[in-house]
Amino acid sequence: MGLERDGILSQDLHFNEVFVSLWQNKLTRYEIARVISARALQLAMGAPALIDINNISSTDVISIAEEEFKRGVLPITIRRRLPNGKIILLSLRKS
């Protein structure tokens, strides 16, 4: 019984490592929504746009924030805390 438990525990650890490696450079839909809404608020409060807004069909702040996100020009870093206490930093700016 102790061996089965250790086997399950090692499988869980392996699953967590695989999960972290797969999702390390991807954002969840909740993170994307949070980033776009935060940037839209900044734009609404008067922050300058990081892209040329003349090339965008719609000039509302959410569309501008979405386009900035798609182009990868946002200087925002997301900090993820994993259950094991490890912290992963994800930069949204594309090199």
UniProtKB/Swiss-Prot annotation:
InterPro entries per UniProt: DNA-dir_RNA_polK_14-18kDa_CS (IPR020708), Pol_omega/Rpo6/RPB6 (IPR006110), RPB6/omega-like_sf (IPR036161), Rpo6/Rpb6 (IPR006111)
Membrane listed as a keyword: no
Catalytic reactions on record: RNA(n) + a ribonucleoside 5'-triphosphate = RNA(n+1) + diphosphate
GO cellular component assignments: cytoplasm; DNA-directed RNA polymerase complex
One Pfam family in the UniProt entry: RNA_pol_Rpb6
Keyword Lipoprotein found: no
GO biological process terms on file: transcription by RNA polymerase I; transcription by RNA polymerase II; tRNA transcription by RNA polymerase III
Broad class of enzyme this protein falls into: transferase
Entry keywords, A to Z: Cytoplasm, DNA-directed RNA polymerase, Nucleotidyltransferase, Transcription, Transferase
Gene Ontology MF annotations: DNA binding; DNA-directed RNA polymerase activity
Subcellular location(s) per record: Cytoplasm
EC number(s) reported in the record: 2.7.7.6
NCBIfam families: PRK01099.1-2, PRK01099.1-3, PRK01099.1-4
Database matches in HAMAP family: RNApol_arch_Rpo6
Record note on quaternary structure: Part of the 13-subunit RNA polymerase complex.
Family to which this protein belongs: Belongs to the archaeal Rpo6/eukaryotic RPB6 RNA polymerase subunit family.
Purpose: DNA-dependent RNA polymerase (RNAP) catalyzes the transcription of DNA into RNA using the four ribonucleoside triphosphates as substrates.
Protein name: DNA-directed RNA polymerase subunit Rpo6
Naturally occurring in which organism (per UniProt): Saccharolobus shibatae (strain ATCC 51178 / DSM 5389 / JCM 8931 / NBRC 15437 / B12) (Sulfolobus shibatae)
Organism taxonomic ancestry: Archaea, Thermoproteota, Thermoprotei, Sulfolobales, Sulfolobaceae
Gene label: rpo6
